[in-house]
A protein has these predicted regions:
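Short, well-structured N-terminal submotif of metal-dependent ribonuclease cores
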Residues: 1-48
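Alpha-helix capping/helix-boundary segments
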Residues: 10, 52, 110, 128-129, ...
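Short catalytic/ligand-binding loop motif for oxyanion handling, primarily in non-cytosolic enzymes
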Residues: 13-14, 55-57, 130-133
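Well-ordered, non-membrane alpha-helical segments in soluble/globular domains
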Residues: 23-31, 70-71, 147-150
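PIN-domain endoribonuclease scaffold, especially VapC-family toxins
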Residues: 38-42, 47-93, 179-180, 191-199
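Active-site neighborhoods of divalent-metal-dependent phosphate/nucleic-acid chemistry enzymes
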Residues: 82-121, 132-138, 195-199
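Short beta-strand and adjacent tight-turn residues that come in two discontinuous sequence segments
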Residues: 124
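Acidic, PIN/NYN-like endoribonuclease modules and their adjacent C-terminal/linker elements
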Residues: 127-199
């Protein structure tokens, strides 16, 4: 089983794409894979904390999404967690205190949630805030942004408090790796990609 934490930015991006009547955007594909219940044959358990769901709710309400739609979105996420292979409940996956290694408290809370849920993968478009002195960073790919500029992507591997490791990946790499049936694991990443030296 793979425990995956989708960051709020991925979910918000998916909702923006839905609202704009787009289809097959990266964020939409990410959510579709998570909802499917399996990734390359492995069962998937979505994990989010109550605080993450509250933040998601606040962002959507601030963006003037109808309250009924917002509650529908939150309820759907809770159901996906509860009916996943591990049957997570966001009230149980508390996440604890934000990880002090991160400057941003919200990102620290997301990382703490991933640790508390024993997640193997965290998907975020906000990689730079999860990299740091105590993390390994690997160059993974280049993508073209909507403005035409090329963006170099990387992933981050962090040691969890339980001695296992967490892969923090950009949504575009997540989809590319699933499409190629690349195993999303620290070992596979270390073998396939070049490490970025720490400053």
């Amino acid at each position: 089983m793979i425990v995956v934490v989708p960051d709020i930015n991925v979910l918000v991006s998916k909702l923006y794409a839905d609202k704009a009547a787009k289809s097959s955007t990266i964020s939409q594909k990410v959510v579709l894979h998570l909802v499917s219940g399996s990734i390359n044959g492995d069962p998937v358990q979505i994990a989010m904390s109550f605080k993450m769901l509250d933040t998601y709710r606040e962002v959507l309400l601030r963006k003037e999404y109808p309250a009924a739609l917002v509650e529908e979105e939150i309820s759907a996420l809770v159901d996906m967690m509860k009916f996943g292979p591990a049957g997570f409940d966001p009230h149980i996956v508390l996440g604890g205190s934000p990880d002090p290694a991160l400057k941003d408290l919200e990102d620290g809370g997301v990382l703490a949630t991933a640790y508390a849920a024993h997640a193997g993968v965290l998907i975020t478009d906000n990689l730079k805030d999860f990299a740091g002195q105590d993390a390994e960073t690997y160059r993974t790919s280049r993508v073209q942004a909507p403005d035409g500029k090329t963006r170099e992507l990387y992933c981050v591997i962090r040691a969890r408090p339980d001695g296992r490791e967490l892969v923090i990946v950009h949504p575009a790499d997540f989809i590319s790796w699933i499409d190629r049936e690349f195993k999303i694991s620290p070992e596979a990443i270390r073998q396939a990609f070049a490490a970025i030296p720490q400053p």
